[in-house]
Amino acid sequence: MAADGIDERSPLISPSSGNVTPTAPPYLQQNNLQAELPPPYTAIASPDASGVPVINCRVCQSLINLDGKLHQHVVKCTVCNEATPIKTPPLGKKYVRCPCNCLLICKDISRRIGCPRPNCRRIINLGPVMLIPEEQPAQPALPVQPEGTRVVCGHCGNTFLWMELRFNTLAKCPHCKKMNCQVPRIQGKNGSAPGKAFRSSVGSALPRRRCCTYITMGMICIFIGVGLTVGTQDFARRFHATYVSWAVAYLVGLVCLIRACYWGAIKFSYPEHSFA
């Protein structure tokens, strides 16, 4: 269950604990996310045996039998297969409930956390958590305005959060470690999704402009090198240091042409969701 050595982005209930997938319906998208604290519970008489401690599931409100599980930090509901905390998190940690009902654990100073479920992959923006006594029900965290943009990598297709709100900038994908040029997504007619014909000319202006600039600089340097080679042949026979100027001109021109090829072949990343 929850421990200090567990990855903060992994769910507290591992897939190996059961082959049944969560059946609780996902929450609707909420403006404020709730920082999970263990709810207060009391030992309630069970219909089968008296004195057996139980607790209500935080997702479906079903009763969870705590017999033999009081040493754990979280317990798994047998109805919706979601986790419910029964103890305070480890020192320096806090619980966070994703809108898809996945219970996560992260550092108490964390501002963002990603949901590891393949069908969710939300980037959760966290606010400062209010100190709440254990005898009171959990309260929602202070609202924090999300920042940044979720973009789709043009190389691997994965989504990542990019904090630069301006377009025409280079974004490095944390998954494949490749560079993308971030461009705005433009809708087609009648609100349809953009195709190749609707790619933003404003967004692609940065790589095109830099590609043309490097081509121009490369050709100028090569022409200068050719001019030096033709015009200073006799002078170079007496002063061999002239060959260095030839090599520098050709080398700079070659580097500029290589950079032009890089900017001409760079791929674009389109925003998935933008936050003001």
Curated annotation (Swiss-Prot):
One example of a Gene Ontology biological process annotation: phosphatidylinositol dephosphorylation
Active site as annotated: C106
GO molecular function terms noted in the UniProt entry: phosphatidylinositol-4,5-bisphosphate 4-phosphatase activity
Biased composition (Basic and acidic residues): 1-10
Keyword Transmembrane listed: yes
Chain residue ranges for the region called Disordered: 1-27
Enzyme Commission designation: 3.1.3.78
UniProt protein name: Type 2 phosphatidylinositol 4,5-bisphosphate 4-phosphatase
Species this protein is from: Xenopus tropicalis (Western clawed frog)
Gene: pip4p2
